[in-house]
Amino acid sequence: MLKILVPTIMLIPLTWYSKKQWVWINPTAHSFLISIASLTLLYHSTDLGYSYSSSFYMDSLSGPLLVLSCWLLPLMMIASQNHLMKEPLNRKKTFLTTLIILQTSLIMAFSSSELIMFYIMFEATLIPTLIIITRWGNQNERLNAGLYFLFYTLTGSLPLLVALLYLHSKIGTLHILTLIMNPKPMELSMPNSILWYACTVAFMVKMPMYGLHLWLPKAHVEAPIAGSMVLAAILLKLGGYGIMRITILTQPITAHVYYPFIVLSLWGMIMTSSICLRQTDLKSLIAYSSVSHMGLVIVAALMQSTLSFMGATALMIAHGLTSSMLFCLANTNYERIHSRTMILARGLQLILPLMCTWWLLASLANLALPPTINLLGELAVIISSFSWSHFSIILLGANTVITALYSLHMLITSQRGKFTHHLYPMKPSFTREHILMMLHMIPLLIISMNPKFILGITY
C-alpha cells in the first residue's frame, strides 16, 4: 500500500520545488505514473481480500475505488490548467497541494482496516474540498455552498462517531477483518436499531440520499472543475463504500430497518430525474443526475445480496468516470461562452465537431447504453430489486426512461440547434481537452469489455 501512499505524499515537495514552466508538468506526469502503478491493486487473490499491515486492508470493494481515486488526480490537474492560468505561481502550487492532500486522505480512507481511522480520513476529506470550493469557485455564492457542505457533512457525521465509540466499548475492537469473523450477530432491539441509524446517516448525507441532498447541487455548481470532478467521482463513493462496509457488520438489523431508506431512495430517483428535465443550468443538471444515480447505489447497498453489491460497485465506478467526464465537458463550454446556461451554448456542433462526439459518448454512457458498464450495474440492481419487491420495477423502469430523456435533452440542447451569433470569436478545442476526455472514456470502454477488472471474484 505504501508504494501508492508515499509517492502521492512526495508530490507535495515536488510541486513546491518545481520551476514555473514545470509546475503543471511535474505533478501531472508523476501522479499519472502513480495511477498506472495502482492498477496492480485490481488483482484479487482471495475472497476476503488481503491485509497489507495492521492499518491497511484491501478487497474487491475498496480496490477499484482506490484505483479510481489515483486515476482521477492527474485528470483533475489537466482539467484545472486553464482555470488557474492567471493565478500567481504560489497559488497554483497551493491548489495542487490541496488536491494532493485530498488524494492522500481518500487513499487512506479506502484502504483503512480500522473503522475509527476510516472515520478520521472520511472527515479529513472535508477540509481540502471546502478550501477548493470556497477559494477557487467562480461566483460569490461559493461561500454559501461551502457552508451547506460543511454543516450537512458535520451534522451527519457526529452520530457515526458516537456509534463507533459505543461499538468499540461493546465489542473491544473496530478492526474490519476481526468484525467480519465475529460469529455473534447483533441482537434485534431498539437501541441496536438506533445504533444502525446513527452509523448510516453520515453515509446517506455523503451519498446523498434524497431529502439530504440539498448541499450537492450547490457545491457542484459553485466548485471549480477539479472540485466538481472529485466530488462527483470519488467523494460521493465514500458514502456508498461506508454503507456497504457498515451494514455487513450490523447484521441482521439491516434487513429489518432498511425499508424507509429503500423507498425514499427509489422515490428520490424519480424526483431528481424529473428535476433534471427542467434544469437550465448545465452543471446543476449533472449534479441532480448524480443524486439520481446514487439513489440506485443506496438501494443496491441495502439489499445485501451478492448481485446487488456487484451492481453497486459497477455503478459507482461507471458513474465516477461518466459524471467526471460530463463536468469536464461542461467546463470546456464554460471556458468558451462564460455561461452555464444550456440554451446559450446551442449549435456548438458546427464549430467544435470533435467535442460534440465526446458529448455524445458521455451522454450515452450516462443513460446506460449497452454495452457500457453502467448498463451492467443498473441491470444487476434492477434484478436484485425485483427479487426483493415486484413493485420496484415500476419506479426503476420510470427512472431508466427519464434518465434517457434528460441525457438526450442535455445533448440536443447544448450541441444541436441554430448557432447563436453572440459567441464570436470562439476558441478551438485543444489537445489537452481531447486527451482529458480520452483518459475518461478509455477506462470506461476497457471495463465494459471486461467487467472482471473491477468486479473481481463476484463477477
UniProtKB/Swiss-Prot annotation:
<feature type="transmembrane region" description="Helical">
    <location>
        <begin position="114"/>
        <end position="134"/>
    </location>
</feature>
<keyword id="KW-0472">Membrane</keyword>
<dbReference type="InterPro" id="IPR000260">
    <property type="entry name" value="NADH4_N"/>
</dbReference>
<keyword id="KW-0520">NAD</keyword>
<dbReference type="GO" id="GO:0005743">
    <property type="term" value="C:mitochondrial inner membrane"/>
</dbReference>
<keyword id="KW-0830">Ubiquinone</keyword>
<feature type="transmembrane region" description="Helical">
    <location>
        <begin position="224"/>
        <end position="244"/>
    </location>
</feature>
<keyword id="KW-0999">Mitochondrion inner membrane</keyword>
<dbReference type="GO" id="GO:0032981">
    <property type="term" value="P:mitochondrial respiratory chain complex I assembly"/>
</dbReference>
<dbReference type="GO" id="GO:0048039">
    <property type="term" value="F:ubiquinone binding"/>
</dbReference>
<feature type="transmembrane region" description="Helical">
    <location>
        <begin position="284"/>
        <end position="303"/>
    </location>
</feature>
<protein>
    <recommendedName>
        <fullName>NADH-ubiquinone oxidoreductase chain 4</fullName>
        <ecNumber>7.1.1.2</ecNumber>
    </recommendedName>
</protein>
<feature type="transmembrane region" description="Helical">
    <location>
        <begin position="147"/>
        <end position="167"/>
    </location>
</feature>
<dbReference type="InterPro" id="IPR010227">
    <property type="entry name" value="NADH_Q_OxRdtase_chainM/4"/>
</dbReference>
<dbReference type="Pfam" id="PF00361">
    <property type="entry name" value="Proton_antipo_M"/>
</dbReference>
<keyword id="KW-1278">Translocase</keyword>
<feature type="transmembrane region" description="Helical">
    <location>
        <begin position="375"/>
        <end position="395"/>
    </location>
</feature>
<dbReference type="GO" id="GO:0006120">
    <property type="term" value="P:mitochondrial electron transport, NADH to ubiquinone"/>
</dbReference>
<comment type="subunit">
    <text>Core subunit of respiratory chain NADH dehydrogenase (Complex I) which is composed of 45 different subunits.</text>
</comment>
<keyword id="KW-1133">Transmembrane helix</keyword>
<dbReference type="GO" id="GO:0015990">
    <property type="term" value="P:electron transport coupled proton transport"/>
</dbReference>
<keyword id="KW-0813">Transport</keyword>
<feature type="transmembrane region" description="Helical">
    <location>
        <begin position="435"/>
        <end position="455"/>
    </location>
</feature>
<feature type="transmembrane region" description="Helical">
    <location>
        <begin position="60"/>
        <end position="80"/>
    </location>
</feature>
<dbReference type="GO" id="GO:0008137">
    <property type="term" value="F:NADH dehydrogenase (ubiquinone) activity"/>
</dbReference>
<keyword id="KW-0812">Transmembrane</keyword>
<comment type="similarity">
    <text>Belongs to the complex I subunit 4 family.</text>
</comment>
<keyword id="KW-0496">Mitochondrion</keyword>
<keyword id="KW-0249">Electron transport</keyword>
<feature type="transmembrane region" description="Helical">
    <location>
        <begin position="22"/>
        <end position="42"/>
    </location>
</feature>
<dbReference type="InterPro" id="IPR003918">
    <property type="entry name" value="NADH_UbQ_OxRdtase"/>
</dbReference>
<dbReference type="Pfam" id="PF01059">
    <property type="entry name" value="Oxidored_q5_N"/>
</dbReference>
<keyword id="KW-0679">Respiratory chain</keyword>
<feature type="transmembrane region" description="Helical">
    <location>
        <begin position="95"/>
        <end position="112"/>
    </location>
</feature>
<feature type="transmembrane region" description="Helical">
    <location>
        <begin position="308"/>
        <end position="330"/>
    </location>
</feature>
<comment type="function">
    <text>Core subunit of the mitochondrial membrane respiratory chain NADH dehydrogenase (Complex I) which catalyzes electron transfer from NADH through the respiratory chain, using ubiquinone as an electron acceptor. Essential for the catalytic activity and assembly of complex I.</text>
</comment>
<feature type="transmembrane region" description="Helical">
    <location>
        <begin position="194"/>
        <end position="214"/>
    </location>
</feature>
<feature type="transmembrane region" description="Helical">
    <location>
        <begin position="257"/>
        <end position="277"/>
    </location>
</feature>
<dbReference type="InterPro" id="IPR001750">
    <property type="entry name" value="ND/Mrp_TM"/>
</dbReference>
<feature type="transmembrane region" description="Helical">
    <location>
        <begin position="350"/>
        <end position="370"/>
    </location>
</feature>
